Amino acid sequence: MQPASAKWYDRRDYVFIEFCVEDSKDVNVNFEKSKLTFSCLGGSDNFKHLNEIDLFHCIDPNDSKHKRTDRSILCCLRKGESGQSWPRLTKERAKLNWLSVDFNNWKDWEDDSDEDMSNFDRFSEMMDHMGGDEDVDLPEVDGADDDSQDSDDEKMPDLE
């Protein structure tokens, strides 16, 4: 029996943990206020996996859930205190070789003023703030309309 490899990421109201076990069977996930226990049989050889995690902060076990797919089991843990950042998943600072941060899904939501806004909306908003309005009065720049010679118009000295 060994722990299943897992990836995790943090959101404003939830913490997500994905246990990477293909063809899992007999999946058992137990949510407690400050602990998560995961077990299953995985792969073609029905290898037994067991993970016990003492969580960094408390969760709401009644509002936490999991979903099994052919490739993994995704656990959605409802935070006990919404909006509280989790710098790590576990209570202990020890590095666990089976646990890593899911940087593909990681988002620095603390600096994000509107989490629900889609990427397209952000792009559209950014484009709206770009130039292109003809009614905008731009400040005068000295020499912008001059036809005088610039320093790059001068002849370069020959190389020796």
Swiss-Prot record:
Motif (PXLE motif): 157-160
UniProt-recorded Gene Ontology molecular function terms: DNA polymerase binding; enzyme binding; Hsp90 protein binding; p53 binding; prostaglandin-E synthase activity; protein-folding chaperone binding; telomerase activity; unfolded protein binding
Site entry: Cleavage: D142, G143
One of the record's GO cellular component terms: telomerase holoenzyme complex
Residues found modified as N6-acetyllysine: K33
Basic and acidic residues biased stretches: 122-132
Metabolic or biological pathway: Lipid metabolism; prostaglandin biosynthesis
Keyword Acetylation: yes
Phosphoserine sites (modified residues): S44, S85, S100, S113, S118, S148, S151
Major localization class: cytoplasm
Domain of life: Eukaryota
Family matches, as InterPro entries: CS_dom, HSP20-like_chaperone, p23-like
Pfam families: CS
Subcellular location(s) of the protein: Cytoplasm
Matches recorded under PROSITE patterns: CS
Biased composition (Acidic residues): 133-153
Region of interest (Disordered), residue spans: 118-160
Tissue: Widely expressed with highest levels in testis.
Induction section of the entry: In brain, by LPS.
Catalytic activity, as annotated: prostaglandin H2 = prostaglandin E2
Enzyme class: isomerase
Enzyme Commission numbers on file: 5.3.99.3
Single GO BP term: chaperone cofactor-dependent protein refolding
Subunit structure: Probably forms a complex composed of chaperones HSP90 and HSP70, co-chaperones STIP1/HOP, CDC37, PPP5C, PTGES3/p23, TSC1 and client protein TSC2. Binds to the progesterone receptor. Interacts with TERT; the interaction, together with HSP90AA1, is required for correct assembly and stabilization of the telomerase holoenzyme complex. Interacts (via PXLE motif) with EGLN1/PHD2, recruiting EGLN1/PHD2 to the HSP90 pathway to facilitate HIF alpha proteins hydroxylation. Interacts with HSP90AA1, FLCN, FNIP1 and FNIP2.
Function comment: Cytosolic prostaglandin synthase that catalyzes the oxidoreduction of prostaglandin endoperoxide H2 (PGH2) to prostaglandin E2 (PGE2). Molecular chaperone that localizes to genomic response elements in a hormone-dependent manner and disrupts receptor-mediated transcriptional activation, by promoting disassembly of transcriptional regulatory complexes. Facilitates HIF alpha proteins hydroxylation via interaction with EGLN1/PHD2, leading to recruit EGLN1/PHD2 to the HSP90 pathway.
Protein name in the entry: Prostaglandin E synthase 3
Natural source organism: Rattus norvegicus
